[in-house]
A protein has these predicted regions:
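Conserved CoA-thioester-binding segment of acyl-CoA-metabolizing enzymes
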Residues: 1-56, 60
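C-terminal alpha-helix plus adjacent terminal tail
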Residues: 1-13, 71, 165-173, 187, ...
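Hydrophobic/aromatic residues within transmembrane alpha-helices
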Residues: 18, 55, 68, 115-117, ...
Length: 262
């Protein structure tokens, strides 16, 4: 089991839980945090025991407030070679293609959107808030809002970006616009995320889950026609046609699942 300085990691029953663990800094990410996030995704890419991941944070105040501005960040001298220290901390940026559920507690601000923009869905506690403080500090809000444009309407992203620290989006509002898929009391946050993760991990075929994800993310970032063409390839990679047909025939023999109504 890997160990880290700024992350907590545990796994059981096919589910890994990654916890940002700098509550004294509102779980802001320093250089060590960024290196460890990249390392944990690399570890998970080769860990077939894990079928689903929960990404959360320690404490009630914040999921993450983005970059730790008190940290030491090296930059090239040229303005055309600026390093964004947290641009590659998310699962997709590290080529990790198994489901990741974000369990958001407290504030999610600025650079936290690099993480939230690359998860499959978000469950938030009722005390969660979302905002981007860049313009309030005299800095352009650019990359983080671009991630949010994939999950929120343009007007909502504009409002969040331009108002900066003057306004925070509540968990309920985030749910209304589709950024968040479920809002629960703080005490129920991890249990709810784990229920979803264990349900996903229980799927009989791992490749079916991965192909579903790959298809939907492809459709999100390209044209429908291109995505549909890719979908044929994803079906083939997940199993030969005769295998899929055989599985379809066996549906009636499967144990009945009693669904939860959300």
């Amino acid at each position: 089991m890997p160990s880290y300085e700024n992350l907590l990691y545990e796994e059981s029953d096919g589910v890994a839980v990654i916890t940002l663990n700098r509550p004294e800094r509102l779980n802001a990410m320093d250089n060590t945090s960024c290196e460890e996030l990249r390392a944990v995704w690399a570890h998970l890419r080769y860990n077939d025991d894990v079928r689903c991941v929960i990404l959360t944070a320690t404490g009630e105040r914040a999921f993450s407030t983005g970059v730790d501005i008190t940290g030491s960040w090296k930059q090239p001298a040229s303005p055309f070679m600026v390093d964004d220290p947290i641009s590659t901390v998310g699962p997709k940026s590290n080529d990790y293609w198994r489901p990741v559920i974000a369990a958001v507690n407290g504030m999610a601000a600025g650079g936290a959107f690099y993480l939230l923009g690359e998860v499959e869905f978000i469950i938030a506690s009722d005390n969660a808030t979302f905002f981007d403080p860049h313009v309030s500090h005299g800095m352009p809000a650019v990359n983080e809002p671009m991630f949010m444009l994939q999950r929120m309407p343009l007007g909502e992203v504009m409002r969040m970006s331009l108002l900066g620290r003057h306004e925070r989006m509540s968990a309920q509002r985030a749910f209304q616009i589709g950024l968040v898929q479920e809002v629960v009391p703080l005490d129920d946050l991890l249990d709810t995320a784990r229920w979803c993760a264990e349900a996903i991990a229980s799927a009989p075929e791992r490749l079916a889950i991965e192909a579903t994800m790959k298809g939907l993310w492809t459709a999100q970032y390209t044209t429908l026609a291109n995505a549909m063409n890719s979908g044929v390839a994803f079906l083939s990679l997940a199993g030969a046609e005769e295998e899929i047909t055989e599985k379809a025939r066996g549906i009636k023999e499967q144990t009945r699942i009693e669904p939860r109504i959300r």
